[in-house]
C-alpha cells in the first residue's frame, strides 16, 4: 500500500532553478529567488490528491463486493456546493467507523489512505466556517454502498473545482 507524498512531485524544478541562478547567487535578489524556489518544493500539491481519493474509493467499492458490510452511516446525499467542506468532514468522520468496525486488512489500508490523502488536501480548508450546513448527526443514515456513491460524488465536485 502506498501513501502518496504530493509535496515531493516537483523536485526537479529546484535543480533547474539552481542552474539558472548559479551565476546570480551573489545578488540579494538571486538569493531570495533561490530560497523561495526551495520553499515552493515543499508546498503541498493538491491537484492530484482528489483523483487519488476517488481511485481509492472505487477500490473500496470493488472490495465490498466480497466483504459483507452491514452498517449504516450518516450520508449527505444532497449536499450544497457551498457546504462541500462541511460535508467532506462528515464523510471522513464516518469513514473512520469502518476502521473500528471491520478488520479486513486491505479495506483498512485503503480507508487509511483515503483519510490521509483527503485530510492532507483539506488541511487548508479544515477551519472554514460554512453557514447553513447540516451537522453530521442531522444527516440521513444510509447503507455503506450509498455512502460510497455520495462520497465519490463530493470528491468529484472537489476535482471539478480544483
Swiss-Prot record:
GO cellular component labels: cytoplasm; cytosol; extracellular region; extracellular space; nuclear speck
Glycosylation: which residues? 104, 108, 119
Primary subcellular site in the record, as a coarse category: secreted
Q: Which keywords has UniProt assigned to this entry? A: Cytokine, Disulfide bond, Glycoprotein, Secreted, Signal
Q: What pairs make up the disulfide bonds?
A: 83-133, 90-136
Q: Which family does it belong to?
A: Belongs to the IL-15/IL-21 family.
Can you name this protein? Interleukin-15
Amino acid at each position: 500500500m502506498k501513501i502518496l507524498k504530493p509535496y515531493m512531485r516537483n523536485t526537479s524544478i529546484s535543480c533547474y532553478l539552481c542552474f539558472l541562478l548559479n551565476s546570480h547567487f551573489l545578488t540579494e535578489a538571486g538569493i531570495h529567488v533561490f530560497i523561495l524556489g526551495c520553499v515552493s518544493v515543499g508546498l503541498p500539491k493538491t491537484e492530484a490528491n482528489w483523483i487519488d481519493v476517488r481511485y481509492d474509493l472505487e477500490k473500496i467499492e470493488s472490495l465490498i463486493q466480497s466483504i459483507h458490510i452491514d452498517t449504516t452511516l450518516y450520508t449527505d446525499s444532497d449536499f450544497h456546493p457551498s457546504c462541500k467542506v462541511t460535508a467532506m468532514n462528515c464523510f471522513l468522520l464516518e469513514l473512520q467507523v469502518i476502521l473500528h468496525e471491520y478488520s479486513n486488512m486491505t479495506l483498512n489500508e485503503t480507508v487509511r489512505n483515503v483519510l490521509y490523502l483527503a485530510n492532507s488536501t483539506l488541511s487548508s480548508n479544515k477551519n472554514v466556517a460554512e453557514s447553513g450546513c447540516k451537522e453530521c448527526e442531522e444527516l440521513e443514515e444510509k447503507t455503506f454502498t450509498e455512502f460510497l456513491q455520495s462520497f465519490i460524488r463530493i470528491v468529484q465536485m472537489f476535482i471539478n473545482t480544483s
